[in-house]
Amino acid sequence: MANMLAISNKAITSTQWGWKPCESPHYGIKVMSVASLIDKKESAVIYKGPRKTNLIKRMLKETFWGKLDFLLIDTPPGTSDEHLTILRLLKNLNPDGAILVSTAQKFSLNTIRKEISFCYKMKLNIIGLVENMSYFVCPNCGTRHD
């Protein structure tokens, strides 16, 4: 995502109000990412349990977003501690709901069913579903690539 938004060489900065997210020069989209917090971009981030939960809390509570029209949170597929932590932290804000993202492959079907069940059990509205990596049409020649 950092490459698509042209922020791969930008770092999160700390201000008196909290962390200042990176901002895409092309789209004005503010991005807060673990990748922007580490010095070596090729390093793996291996956080588990409480350390991961604390980082999520800090990213949500200590980031100075300014005025937002909406907040998108990119999470790993499935239903995990990350999802529970985020939902617990945002519950008082009464989020409008979730936009689920899946791929067109058959193995993704079970995962998306679990995510739908998770949203239902947590009383979180599903706003929509995005099918990712289905195909693209070349803007130069018009050829469809699956």
Model region roles, listed by residue range:
Residues L37-L89:
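Phosphate-binding/switch loop-helix module in NTP-utilizing enzymes
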